[in-house]
Regions:
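Internal low-complexity, small-residue/proline-rich segments
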Residues: 40-198
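N-terminal single-pass transmembrane signal-anchor helix
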Residues: 12-46, 56
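N-terminal leader/signal peptides at the extreme start of proteins
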Residues: 1-17, 80-81
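Short acidic linear motifs
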Residues: 2-9, 25-26, 59, 132
């Protein structure tokens, strides 16, 4: 009968360095495989949120149309000196401001003093500074403020919140003829849903 030495009978406790490195490597590989899946899930959630924003805006436009029998104008403005309609005049609020009540943004809409004061009026500072998430796609990481400048001098006039969703002015270049468009949202437009035949 052979005798086992005391050293042979001791239990081996702990990990070797190689075993520890193998476990760390396996965990690292698993994380590397799971990270893209997590990022894809986040991107899918952002896309879903973006689609939901478009759905809310579309519904608000439909509710506006049901109320006023027309889609909101691209923008309304007049020459402050003459009071006559002028695409480059004031107040200059566009379609996105006009549908605010239909996006459950009544307090903000009421702050605009019924769109009578110009965008640049100090009383509209609070409204101008408000960035609405419904007008932004979550995948956009850019600055959500746009600087309105005087065209002749390039001097900044004010900052305005941006939107990832634009109304279609038409096929004309807005710079060439700001008062005329063949889309849905142009100066003083009164387009009904029934007027839209091609999309």
């Amino acid at each position: 009968m052979s005798r086992m030495s005391w050293r042979d009978r001791t239990l081996r406790l702990g990990f070797t360095l190689i075993e520890l490195l193998a476990v760390i490597t396996i965990i690292g590989i698993m994380i590397a495989l799971l990270l893209p899946a997590v990022q894809q899930t986040r991107e899918a959630a952002r896309r879903t949120s973006c689609k939901n924003n478009l759905k809310q805006i579309g519904l608000a436009l439909q509710l506006y149309h049901d109320t006023w029998q027309t889609l909101p104008p691209g923008w309304l403005a007049r020459d402050p000196a003459t009071g006559r309609a002028d695409p480059e005049g004031e107040p200059g609020w566009g379609w996105a401001a006009r549908i605010l009540p239909f996006l459950e943004q009544d307090p903000l809409f009421n702050q605009l003093v019924h769109l009578e004061l110009p965008i640049t009026d100090p009383q509209n500072d609070w409204a101008r500074a408000t960035v609405l998430s419904v007008y932004l796609c979550p995948t956009d990481s850019h600055n959500h403020q746009w600087v309105l400048e005087d065209e002749s001098t390039g001097v900044p006039i004010t900052e305005l919140p941006t939107s990832n969703y634009a109304g279609v002015f038409g096929t004309f270049d807005i710079e060439d003829n700001p008062g005329r468009g063949d889309g849905v949202f142009f100066f003083q437009s009164r387009v009904r849903v029934a007027d839209i035949h091609d999309g």
